[in-house]
């Protein structure tokens, strides 16, 4: 369907980044961005890791908008990418008899990691407004010996305003391949009538997933301690949280009413994953809500709202 004269053309934003290990041990980058995506000033962490914040200057997506992010991490490089703010997906536009729901907004992430690379992708949450249509695709290729850490938190509807997903829909496709084997292949499609299902969202508006593909298989005791610590990190957080092993690495799931709880738990897991690798402890990202930093580092006592699933 073509745009009418009264409609602005959809956004086609993109980011392309290549990370390489420099002679001085720091990670350097090359690439660029196309509006409305923008690369903010990066900085180098104490361990030489390149820290890169991404900004979506349009503030959100509507039906027809597309964002494409392509990442390549060369051998030995270390990088961490996050976003400056939550990604907002507004109600769809372009409704017609042919497309009664309207057009979809699309976000695509492609990442390729060479052996020895370490890439962390931890953006802030995505908020899907009532009536919004979002299709998200993530394709990750990890060479043996590389480390991938990725997290995704999605809120379905602005629940603080009493809003649900309405006529909206969220679709997510995630595939992670390590060498010649698939580590994760997922397809998810959610709409409002499915959310109360106890085998799905159970009436909760927030879902989150954290996946770590380790460079090498962990020893049994090492993995057991990592999972035990991750379960202890649920202390004081509301929602249902589960964590389990991958070959090699781990996967953690969150389902509940608080994107803050998901973010705090994932940050605690991030610290443990860094420690297992013998890497420096991560700092609370500068672009994340600063008032949450103390909660992330010093958990509150457990509450009756916490559900600890394995």
Swiss-Prot record:
Statement: the UniProt record of this protein carries the keyword Chaperone: yes
The keyword Cytoplasm belongs to this UniProt entry's keyword annotation: yes
Subunit structure as annotated in this protein's UniProt entry: UreD, UreF and UreG form a complex that acts as a GTP-hydrolysis-dependent molecular chaperone, activating the urease apoprotein by helping to assemble the nickel containing metallocenter of UreC. The UreE protein probably delivers the nickel.
One Pfam family recorded for the sequence: UreD
Keywords of the record: Chaperone, Cytoplasm, Nickel insertion
Subcellular location: Cytoplasm
Recorded family membership: Belongs to the UreD family.
Protein function: Required for maturation of urease via the functional incorporation of the urease nickel metallocenter.
CC per GO annotation: cytoplasm
Protein name as it appears in the record: Urease accessory protein UreD
Any one Gene Ontology molecular-function term assigned to this protein's record: nickel cation binding
Chief location category: cytoplasm
Matching HAMAP family: UreD
Gene name, Swiss-Prot/TrEMBL: ureD
Recorded superkingdom: Bacteria
């Amino acid at each position: 369907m073509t745009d009418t004269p009264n409609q602005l053309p959809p956004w086609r934003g993109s980011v392309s980044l290549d990370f390489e290990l420099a002679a001085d041990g720091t990670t350097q980058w090359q690439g660029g961005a196309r509006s409305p995506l923008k690369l903010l000033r990066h900085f180098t962490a104490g361990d030489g890791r390149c820290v890169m914040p991404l900004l979506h200057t349009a503030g959100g997506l509507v039906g027809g908008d597309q964002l494409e992010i392509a990442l390549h991490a060369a051998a030995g490089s270390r990088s961490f990418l996050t976003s400056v703010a939550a990604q907002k997906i507004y109600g769809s536009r372009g409704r017609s008899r042919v497309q009664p729901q309207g057009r979809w907004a699309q976000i695509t992430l492609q990442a390729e990691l060479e052996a020895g690379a370490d890439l962390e992708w931890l953006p802030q949450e995505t908020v899907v407004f009532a009536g919004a249509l979002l299709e998200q695709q993530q394709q990750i290729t990890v060479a043996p010996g590389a480390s991938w850490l990725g997290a995704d938190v999605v809120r379905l509807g602005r629940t603080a305003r009493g809003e649900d997903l309405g006529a909206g829909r969220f679709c997510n496709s995630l595939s992670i391949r390590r060498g010649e084997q698939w580590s994760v292949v997922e397809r998810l499609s959610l709409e409002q009538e499915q959310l109360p299902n106890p085998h799905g969202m159970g009436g909760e508006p927030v879902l989150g997933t954290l996946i770590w593909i380790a460079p090498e298989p962990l020893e049994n005791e090492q993995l057991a301690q990592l999972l035990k610590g991750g379960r202890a990190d649920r202390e004081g957080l509301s929602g249902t949280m589960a964590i389990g092993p991958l070959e090699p690495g781990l996967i953690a799931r969150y389902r509940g009413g608080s994107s803050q709880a998901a973010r705090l738990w994932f940050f605690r897991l991030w610290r443990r994953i860094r420690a297992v690798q013998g890497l420096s402890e991560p700092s609370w990202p500068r672009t994340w809500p600063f008032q949450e930093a103390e909660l992330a580092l010093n958990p509150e006592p457990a509450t009756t709202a916490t559900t600890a699933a394995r």
